[in-house]
């Protein structure tokens, strides 16, 4: 079977009004400018996506296109992680942070047989273990805290402070120095253990007890911030039976003061319409002159809010239904999806794809480009009843439009859809956009995204035209990394595919990491960091380490 497919047909181009801004837009320079404003090194990678725009595109660097984890060729160091790793690495101020489980037993008081959520800190230069923030599993079990999954979120770092969400639904601020600086930073300073292998907690906020949230399986939001505003998706979701939301009134989206943990505003717009869980992460940008924080909802809608809120409350700017109105939700056979990917901001536009918990299988997907300058309901269409063709029908959880009941949809004159990509031929597997957990990466107006069915897509970011796909023959949970003119992407077989950033297909190399790669590679300080299922690797041109079996 041919693994490479060149696409020639156009995707549905809904509107070109916002599709062309500056041809000279440089996402690398934008991210570098933001990173330079933070208390981190100028070539660090201090959060998921590098900056609040979440575009996983870094400065050009001499990153290898060949290495060997067994012989140690071009590997600076590697360090063991837990038995399962889903947290994307973050690199800041000489340290590497990654979420995993306790399978390696780094902390002296917990044997490696003790299931924990763990955020582990390593020395960037040699991979030496420094400390671990350990979180015991919730007693309610898998409905709230799935066994062995560890910490699935990435932290955000500024100076000597780090913020992330634990497996227990707690937003915590940690001292990146741990107790190695000889101090117990507060206001929280009642840690039971202050050993060097322990984390130093500055403050902690429990969303389950303090906001009434009932997270489903896991809270996996990777936080971002601007100024002192910290943005959080709570993970509020369905019960163990997957039928109802036990806490439909609890917030889905939160803005906090990152210095103190004070809640500044909340919103529960998805409400009882959450389909399953809420596992997306927010993005932030100044769009149309307005500071916007953008959240992917568990109801399949994308929401934008005024970042600072208004009078202590959330102020929604726009919302966009990312699913066809006739799609429906049902366990293991749904055509309606929610949003797991992180929205990405590029050249004034917003990009996001829809997906589902991989445990619920593959399915058709939708990739959108959205103009964020409109207001209100900016979905492509709205639903009406034939008996009242002027009043839009409010959204329903399982199916927005039921034709047999006399409902119909009409084009929304206020639509913010720029383009919609479902693939160039949805009848052909290799030319279909499937469900995705992955976040897009964009450079030179070329968008790259991997879907859960294992296809890497190259798409025109301005028009939605598909250029090519590549079948990795393995599921992909990850997102692409763009370094200079190369793309790096991992899959469940443990392969890292390396491709040229081009509308013409060019596979440069495929390198196996020895175990499944569920995370996204990152580059910091001219070093490539990759976490496979159970090990973290630092890869650099010309390096040599002992290697692993």
Kindly give the residue locations of the regions a language model identified.
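Bacterial N-terminal signal peptides that target proteins for export
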Residues: 1-9
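Noncatalytic, solvent-exposed loop/strand surfaces
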Residues: 21-549
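Intrinsically disordered or highly flexible coil/loop and linker segments, enriched in small
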Residues: 2-3, 17, 359
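Bacterial N-terminal signal peptides
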Residues: 8-17
